[in-house]
Amino acid sequence: MDGAPVVAITGMTFHDLIGTRYQQGVDTTKLMQDVALYNVEVTGPEHAVLVTNRACRVALGDRGVAHLTVSKDTQMMRLATDKRSMGNPGARTSSSWMQVVNQPPLDQLRAAADALNSGRKVAILVGQGP
C-alpha cells in the first residue's frame, strides 16, 4: 500500500442471505481483512454513523485502508427509524478531525541538530514505521 487514506465501501446481499451461498454472494469482510486496518460489517443506520466516523479517522490517522460493507437491506433503512441499543450511549468522538503533526518541538530539534553537528562519524538510519 502507498499510505493513502482510503475508505472502501462495499455492498452485500440481503442480511438474511449472507453465508447461504446465495447467488454471487461474497464475504467482503473476509476479502478485505488482509489489507484493511479497519474492517466492519454495518448492521444498521445508527451503527453506520459510528463506524463511518471511525473508518474515516482510521484511514486518515493511520494512513491506510478502512473498509465498511453494507447489506442490501441495510442500505435501504432510514436513520430516523433505527434505534440505538441500550449499550450505545450515542456520539463518542469529536465532530472535528485534527491531523497528527509528526514534528518534534523546535528546542528538541535544535538539540538533536547540535548533537549531530558535534559528531565526527555520524550515521543516520531513517525509516517509516507502520
Each PLM stretch: what is its role?
Residues 1-130:
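N-terminal alpha/beta PP-like core and its mobile active-site loop of ThDP/TPP-dependent enzymes
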